[in-house]
Amino acid sequence: MGAITLDGKATRDEIFVDLKERVAALTEQGRTPGLGTVLVGDDPGSQAYVRGKHSDCAKVGINSIRRDLPADISQAELDATIDELNANPECTGYIVQLPLPKHLDENAALERIDPGKDADGLHPTNLGRLVLNEPAPLPCTPRGIVHLLRRYEVEIAGAHVVVIGRGVTVGRPLGLLLTRRSENATVTLCHTATRHLPQFTREADIIVAAAGVPHMVTAEMVRPGAAVIDVGVSRDDNGKLVGDVAPDVWEVAGHVSPNPGGVGPLTRAFLLTNVVERAEALARG
């Protein structure tokens, strides 16, 4: 018997129904949320991501604010665009689409974002607030992972979660999220240089693979019945996009998130959620 599929697309659609109602209520008050994007250059992947985010906005009634800039823009011109969105009352939250061209300073750009308008939840100030368990926009992918597990009633409280990956977008903040009292998981943070990795994963109730190594998690590394979340994105030798979880894991695990179609749709859903939540907070005063 194969694993139960953790369906991110269906779960995203449920979130969108809720967001559409909340946005409609805000619009009645004259407070329609606005999501901004800053896209530099013409990278096809980045363009596709940005199009997808604005398509999502249209589905739930959020206003789209696009700032598409040429690849040869200067740091000063990029900074001016960020400052404009920080000051723009129509923009509730926004993102700077990465990667930026190599002549631009990504960290400087991200730190220039108003933390209150940080739709990704990855501003250093907001990550610090997560450490301190203070209210702040939450990182979208870790939030999506927790929501997906709860949607399918995978027990988190008391669970041993092994996270493979130490990046700032998933691995590090996910550990912070899962060890809050509201989640109460025990987290082991591993990575590509972890010795004897299978010894850790075989003890896990939940495995989150976010290392970007094709099919690194195999069936022999998974305890029967465990939940496995595949967040990794990389390309195999043929140039095909693949995740971190090998196909044979589906025969051993109790729950598996597909990739694509698992966590990715929820990352985008919680980008919108962060914007709507800020609009609601502003409406409350």
UniProtKB/Swiss-Prot annotation:
Reaction(s) catalyzed by this protein? (6R)-5,10-methylene-5,6,7,8-tetrahydrofolate + NADP(+) = (6R)-5,10-methenyltetrahydrofolate + NADPH; (6R)-5,10-methenyltetrahydrofolate + H2O = (6R)-10-formyltetrahydrofolate + H(+)
Q: Which UniProt keywords apply?
A: Amino-acid biosynthesis, Histidine biosynthesis, Hydrolase, Methionine biosynthesis, Multifunctional enzyme, NADP, One-carbon metabolism, Oxidoreductase, Purine biosynthesis
Positions annotated to bind NADP(+): G165, R166, G167, T192, V233
**GO BP term, example:** tetrahydrofolate interconversion
Molecular function GO terms recorded: methenyltetrahydrofolate cyclohydrolase activity; methylenetetrahydrofolate dehydrogenase (NADP+) activity
Gene3D superfamilies xrefs: Leucine Dehydrogenase, chain A, domain 1 (3.40.50.10860), NAD(P)-binding Rossmann-like Domain (3.40.50.720)
Could you tell me which InterPro entries the record lists for this protein? Aminoacid_DH-like_N_sf, NAD(P)-bd_dom_sf, THF_DH/CycHdrlase, THF_DH/CycHdrlase_cat_dom, THF_DH/CycHdrlase_NAD-bd_dom
Pathway assignment reads: One-carbon metabolism; tetrahydrofolate interconversion
Q: Which Pfam families match?
A: THF_DHG_CYH (PF00763), THF_DHG_CYH_C (PF02882)
Keyword set includes Oxidoreductase? yes
Any single Gene Ontology cellular-component annotation: cytosol
Q: What is its EC number?
A: 1.5.1.5, 3.5.4.9
What NCBIfam families does its record include? Answer: PRK14193.1
Subunit composition and interactions: Homodimer.
Which family does the UniProt entry place this protein in?
Belongs to the tetrahydrofolate dehydrogenase/cyclohydrolase family.
Describe its function.
Catalyzes the oxidation of 5,10-methylenetetrahydrofolate to 5,10-methenyltetrahydrofolate and then the hydrolysis of 5,10-methenyltetrahydrofolate to 10-formyltetrahydrofolate.
What this protein is called in its record is: Bifunctional protein FolD
Q: What does the record give as the organism's lineage?
A: Bacteria, Bacillati, Actinomycetota, Actinomycetes, Mycobacteriales
Q: Encoded by which gene?
A: folD
